[in-house]
Amino acid sequence: MRIPLVLALALASAFAVLPSLASAGVPCGICNSTVPLCVTLVGAAGDAPAAEFGEFVVIMRDLANNPIAGAMVVIDLSNAPDMHFCADQMDPTMTVDCANNRVSKVTAADGSVHFTLLGGSNGAGNASTLLNGGMIFANGVLLQYPTVAAYDLDGSGGVGANDVSALLGDFGLGQPFGRCDYDCSGKVGANDLSLWLKAYGSGTMTRSCGSSCP
């Protein structure tokens, strides 16, 4: 089958710009970059975020697989009304934009940036966001729609009995609410309860947000 001349020229032009895009450091979230499918909001104990249960890394690479240093990586919860960030993320390198329910950090020389996100949800019976409710951007390019979970499901008093009540309530509804999908399986089940109990038993999330983003 012959390729029409116009289409052939268009394809040639597209491939011709790939090297220049790569050298310009254009993020490639669907090929070379490392971006999580799921992220989990955690609490803190004193001034120590529970990194063990929530830390993740984003690694930015361009089309030539080169690391992109100085890229602005944004975690956006504006499409997840039942989830919130803490106004204080206990991370001096993180910028918090409460008005738009998002946070951001800048990648290091190797293209990586580490996040431990402090935040929670809005209590039993109030879940509304299903899977893939968050957004991750780098330099304005949308890279991923991650599922967003939270251990502090009522957003008050640290991780405790009210939170497990909310988890069981979400499970009983049979809906894949993202806030309880701790194992990133796409559903709420027994393993999520096990992971919640492990987080609770660790004693690392005794503190909720002092002030929450709207």
Question: Could you describe each region identified by the protein language model?
Answer:
Residues M1-P4:
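Positively charged n-region of N-terminal signal peptides that target proteins for export
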